[in-house]
């Protein structure tokens, strides 16, 4: 998954860096999303279509998180829960199938990238948005919603955790010896 993201980012920077000023390449703006270079947006699935497909395949707990202010590779992140490995693969297949059907007869077909097809976390990358399909245990473990909500909130929990790391905790004295009293 990270290799796909890394390759997409590097190819975007190489292919679209001439469109932007050099100091705006890494700026997180909606204009520099992965869909910025696509001229015919009608061929790509829209967010309501993806939500309908996820509802049709009975994906549980579908969450849409707007990420255009936080990252440049996607405008939205969609997180859905599948009940089994088969259900996760079915979610991915339904999304890819619908993208193929919508682009039938087009000169250039743009298919989404699918990563982790035989795992408990499948990522389908459409360019404008990224769909994460996880099973219940993986979704609870990775807790992707809190990553994006913590990033969007004003409080930074990483600084608070860093401050707590440097607090020295003295171990409790469990020896039978009484501590020596220092007289002054």
Swiss-Prot record:
Q: Which SUPFAM superfamilies match?
A: Nucleotidyltransferase (SSF81301)
Keyword Transit peptide on entry: yes
Q: Name one GO cellular component term.
A: mitochondrion
- UniProt keywords, alphabetically: Mitochondrion, Transit peptide
Name of the molecule in the record: Protein Iojap-related, mitochondrial
Per the UniProt record, the source organism is: Arabidopsis thaliana
Q: Where is the transit peptide?
A: 1-39
Role of this protein: May be a ribosome silencing factor involved in organelle biogenesis and required for germination.
Q: Where in the cell is it found?
A: Mitochondrion
Q: Which family does it belong to?
A: Belongs to the Iojap/RsfS family.
